């Protein structure tokens, strides 16, 4: 088993804290049209592409956010697992970025452009069933899937890619 450095542990803790703070701040943003919710903290789901410390950081941050906001057990468990699955998928795309000289607009490698897809997919697949279970509205799963997808595209895709563009400033992420 690989030993975890103090730097990795500190990075994971900082990401967890930032995810939690951003999630709590996002709870004050009213849902657009009553359906779409934008959890700004989801922009951080791009971070496993840059550091493996983000995987536990995001998972713990999501778990803490859900605990603090009083999420129901289904959301607490499956929402946190969706974040973990997305983080692992994003980290897996790191290899795609390392093994190709192909860069796309903004000078970012292909893997960085694809990095938002795992959390978008994980949340779009898992969360509609959680919302349907909690709301007791199973017939609304397609609507819930669409609303989660839109929120994830904006936060993971849009904001996450803006965050990824900061990779040109390695002092922000360090080197791992």
Task: Please tell me what each predicted stretch does.
Residues 1-56:
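Hydrophobic transmembrane alpha-helices
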Residues 24-35, 43, 63-176:
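Membrane-embedded alpha-helical hairpins and interfacial helices in multi-pass inner-membrane proteins
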Residues 58-62:
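Extracytosolic (periplasmic/ER-lumenal) interhelical loops and adjacent juxtamembrane/interface segments
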């Amino acid at each position: 088993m690989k030993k975890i450095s103090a730097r990795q542990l500190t990075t994971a803790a900082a990401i967890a804290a930032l995810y939690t703070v951003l999630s709590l701040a996002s709870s004050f943003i009213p849902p657009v049209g009553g359906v779409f919710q934008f959890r700004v903290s989801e922009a951080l789901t791009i971070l496993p592409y840059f550091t493996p410390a983000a995987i536990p950081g995001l998972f713990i941050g999501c778990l803490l956010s859900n605990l603090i906001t009083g999420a129901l057990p289904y959301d607490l468990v499956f929402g946190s697992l969706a974040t973990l699955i997305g983080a692992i998928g994003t980290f897996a795309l790191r290899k795609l970025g390392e093994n190709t000289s192909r860069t796309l607009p903004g000078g970012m490698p292909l893997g960085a452009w694809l990095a938002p897809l795992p959390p978008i997919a994980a949340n779009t697949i898992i969360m509609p069933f959680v919302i349907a279970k909690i709301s007791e509205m199973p017939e609304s799963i397609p609507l819930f899937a669409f609303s989660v997808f839109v929120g994830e595209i904006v936060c993971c895709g849009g904001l996450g890619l803006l965050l990824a563009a900061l990779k040109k400033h390695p002092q922000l992420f360090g080197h791992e």
